[in-house]
Amino acid sequence: MDIMKDKIRQALSELDILATEVQIDQWLDYLKLLEKWNKVYNMTAIKNIDEMLVKHLFDSLAVAKYIKGDSTVDVGTGGGLPGVVLAILYPQHQFTLVDSVGKKIMFLKNVKKSLSLNNINPINTRIENLEGNFDNIISRAFSSVDTFYELCKHFLTEHNQMLAMKGRDLEERNLESLPLNIEKYSIKVPFLNAERNLIVMRKKL
């Protein structure tokens, strides 16, 4: 476990993120819960906690600096990625975690209780049925960018942003058709030799 903690500290340093030992323990406790539930409920395709450390934890932390304001909705959150990871980092920020699969929300309610994460609100619904005001609308491996926009455009205002976490495929053709101001960022994930990108979308003024 000390080796994993050292790896987290190194990743935090590379990402220029300050975190406490309590937060590091919370991230590890979360991954252990995810690994445990995964054996029964198939929460994620990644089964090994060492692999989860990089492909889930570090991948989620790599977009932390792009989160603005006080509230975020995590669309198709699955096992809580990136929402739970970011909620541990930003305890004053409210995260609404949305998924249509009941067992995943059941898991997230367990995470909330086990880790005393009072700033997450897991909701079992389809995103198009949710109402609310959020500074960030984020998705990771949820859908194509144009589908993400169509399902979530009712949240978009002049003051907030949509963030799509993507791999190599930036869906350039889909992006060109969207009536939005779009910025693309190349994301470096510590210990991961794979292309990661973040697409930030805002309403045209």
From Swiss-Prot:
Keywords: Cytoplasm, Methyltransferase, rRNA processing, S-adenosyl-L-methionine, Transferase. It catalyses: guanosine(527) in 16S rRNA + S-adenosyl-L-methionine = N(7)-methylguanosine(527) in 16S rRNA + S-adenosyl-L-homocysteine. It comes from the Bacteria. It is an enzyme of class 2 (transferase). S-adenosyl-L-methionine binds at G76, L81, I127, E128, R140. SUPFAM superfamilies: S-adenosyl-L-methionine-dependent methyltransferases. It is found in: Cytoplasm. One of its GO terms (cellular component) is cytosol. Transmembrane segments: none annotated. Its EC number is 2.1.1.170. Specifically methylates the N7 position of guanine in position 527 of 16S rRNA. Belongs to the methyltransferase superfamily. RNA methyltransferase RsmG family. This is Ribosomal RNA small subunit methyltransferase G.
